Amino acid sequence: MATAAESGARTWPGSGSPRLGSPAGSPVLGISGRARPGSGPERTGRAIGSVAPGHSFRKVTLTKPTFCHLCSDFIWGLAGFLCDVCNFMSHEKCLKQVKTPCTSIAPSLVRVPVAHCFGSLGLYKRKFCVVCRKSLEVPAFRCEVCELHVHPDCVPFACSDCRQCHQDGQHDYDTYHHHWREGNLPSGARCEVCRKTCGSSDVLAGVRCEWCGVQAHSVCSTALTPECTFGRLRSMVLPPSCVRLLSRNFSKMHCFRIPETMVLELGDGDDGLDGSAAVGTGREVSAATESTKQTLKIFDGNDSMRKNQFRLVTVSRLARNEEVMEAALRAYYINEDPKDFQLQALPLTLLSGNAQALGKAGTTEEETSKDSGPGDSVPEAWVIRSLPRTQEILKIYPDWLKVGVAYVSIRVNSQSTARSVVQEVLPLFGRQVEDQERFQLIEVLMSSRQVQRTVLVDEEPLLDRLRDIRQTSVRQASQTRFYVAEARAVTPHVSLFVGGLPPGLSPQDYSNLLHEAMATKAAVVSVSHVYSLQGAVVLDVTCFAEAERLYMLARDTAVHGRPLTALVLPDVLHTKLPPDCCPLLVFVNPKSGGLKGRELLCSFRKLLNPHQVFELTNGGPLPGFHLFSQVPCFRVLVCGGDGTVGWVLAALEETRRHLACPEPSVAILPLGTGNDLGRVLRWGAGYSGEDPFSVLVSVDEADAVLMDRWTILLDAHEIDSTENNVVETEPPKIVQMNNYCGIGIDAELSLDFHQAREEEPGKFTSRFHNKGVYVRVGLQKISHSRSLHKEIRLQVEQQEVELPSIEGLIFINIPSWGSGADLWGSDSDSRFEKPRIDDGLLEVVGVTGVVHMGQVQGGLRSGIRIAQGSYFRVTLLKATPVQVDGEPWIQAPGHMIISATAPKVHMLRKAKQKPRKAGAIRDTRVDTLPAPEGNPL
């Protein structure tokens, strides 16, 4: 640990009497934001005493229109009150009502530390950073699980206050409180308490519960009941108390099956002014800000020196020592007395070297004691060091729920050990009668991206431990907690889903195959579930290290030329589910609907429990059905095109016997091009940016209906090979049909479109472009004549049916074809029954060519009604284009047998909108939840 500077060392000690509003006189420290020199309000006075949690307010002169962060109203006049630490701006009249804590003390107020899941950089319009409270005018990060937005250089200072979405054996509670997130509400948001506007698009104002969505002013939120009931979607949410995942060796990205992005580090920032700070990664300052000011590079301990990450602080050349120390501490949001720290100069020779040399420089004091004068060509560089302490006040938190007690404070000295601290605090928590040997002290590092727990040995000297933490990073010390916890033997258990294996093998064969590919350890790895048809297994792993090894190895392993898929799955405690709980299992195809699929994926993770939202490109629908296999009642939402819906329904049919709820109802959010099934079930022609919350409410209110599914057996004739006189036999093929099956011209058009999309997939990202390609392909076939009726034979219910002169034969199960066209028509006909999706009948329709198909699309004509039945046999006399639900191919000569699949599937049809009475108050969450925005770069 750095001690006082030796003779000849240049230091800025944090001595002297602190002025009012300084770190010593205020309960909080921090930086004043990302302001450029001269861009912020002009400071006109000394800091005033702060009654708000941790803020250090200063009266400033306003030079541009400014809004209050509490009431979100415009600040009239020239004077406002700005927190030097977090940029919180307030009216003078609002100061006494400020409840929002300052950024620098926010980590100490976190109830249960949970790390965030930051995705890729994106542009988020009219959003604000929760750390510095400034707008996100540059690419920024957002959490994939909660509504936290943050600048890249502010990420290290964000709290680990994400939603707790499962139990992990630590801090497990059955009762959940509101999880408040400040700001980024729409301008029309209304407070749940006073019914006045609480949102703003100009500043970070108002709060919203991440679970139930209730919105309120920060002042009014204290009037609400602390317990959260999950709001309007409570019956659809998978309760966190009913999900268990021991994720010791896995990141949050692994736990929620979110693709990992770049490792976040401090990025380049803006130059600071008057104690404000900006982040740098070895970036030099281009020019001096003012002749009367100097810019300093400030490092925080050995860790930032090793990574060559610093923050720039600009102060007056006439600044007192304590003022420079305060500015340096504010730059890193350090909420401690500046008299306990000093600044040590770093030599110019090390600054011009590489990051590795700079990291080594932080290990010895002799190397950092060289002089670095203000006249150097680069800004002066200093490192924050903690002065030696003979004793400290340490906060100890209970690892169990203790009503009315968040922590206790005790004094530790050089004689204090982890065991002595445990013995001292247990009586303070009311556990004095219990065996103290069963308790241990746990150190918890609460960074924004990872929460690390370390069990301290009984003989660990705590004062030395704190010294080592501060030597590494002073900011890290403020993000470190100590918990007293009962030592419990946790039995490791991790469920790993492994897909991409060869189908049709036995459990023993799969076990042997995995052992050959990944050298699994039989003592701790066993196959718990086998899905032979899909070529997938679920492994039970009773060793955390082995589970992590298998997970990382499987993602880089291929078996029989196919890459494996590995997912970490939690356990759903189905016996703990509330009686009225019917959770929604969500499948999203991010490739559908352009970027809308990706945005919906993020939105549903935030509205529901992210464990119940699955990305279909990462393992398909099988992992989701396995996770919900023991849930007695659940529903399904499929976000994608008709092909995606068919994919999920096929997986449901294959796994039905494994499910405790064998017939879940399925809703659709159409993202494809045609979306015929979505149209029939009233979900619309395609998703056009509706509020995701409103979509979930519609799913909850939807009506259950039955729908027929059909099995098509494709049995090709034997093919004679003229080269070697060998008879080749194409094996029979079985496909499932939900919407329609086309033979002839419509399948040929679909095949041409499919081939064009495979050649240039990047161009097929919008429905408008896709339909344009269909039109162009159709025009090319307008003079085509095939005489399909001469090339096929049709039997309906064992009876031969004579076909008229047609080019296409279509079997339809739903009254929508080709993006909403009514191919059967609405005219009544005594020969046929009125079609329904659950009548057990298929309608057979013919088309005479591309022109006829265009007329049907335009509503000018209908198709040629040929037959209606439940069993069909089609004989193909030559190779013919065939398509089923939009998937085309060339079918060899042979037979096609179409028959009903039992049982019928349960679908959800959107309820008709009821007319709203004039003046009726709408649901707050429905009105005010912002639509997803932000495009990944």
From Swiss-Prot:
Residue numbers spanned by region Disordered: 1-48, 359-378, 911-937
Intervals of motif LXXLL motif 1: 550-554
Entries under Gene3D superfamilies matching the protein: 2.60.200.40, 3.30.60.20, Phosphatidylinositol 3-kinase Catalytic Subunit, Chain A, domain 1, Probable inorganic polyphosphate/atp-NAD kinase, domain 1
Keyword Acetylation: no
Residues recorded with modification Phosphoserine: S22, S26
Tissues showing expression: Widely expressed with higher expression in the brain and, to a lesser extent, in the small intestine, duodenum, and liver. In brain, expressed in gray matter. Expression is most intense in the cerebellar cortex and hippocampus, while moderate expression is seen in the olfactory bulb neuronal layers and brain stem nuclei. In the cerebellar cortex, equally expressed in both the Purkinje cell somata and the granule cells.
Domain DAGKc: 579-716
Motif LXXLL motif 2 per UniProt: ranges: 569-573
Keywords: ATP-binding, Cell membrane, Cytoplasm, Cytoskeleton, Kinase, Lipid metabolism, Membrane, Metal-binding, Nucleotide-binding, Nucleus, Phosphoprotein, Repeat, Synapse, Transferase, Zinc, Zinc-finger
Activity regulation info: Activated by phosphatidylserine.
Family according to the record: Belongs to the eukaryotic diacylglycerol kinase family.
Domain notes: The L-X-X-L-L repeats are both required for binding and phosphatidic acid-mediated activation of the nuclear receptor NR5A1.
Protein name per its UniProtKB record: Diacylglycerol kinase theta
Annotated gene: Dgkq
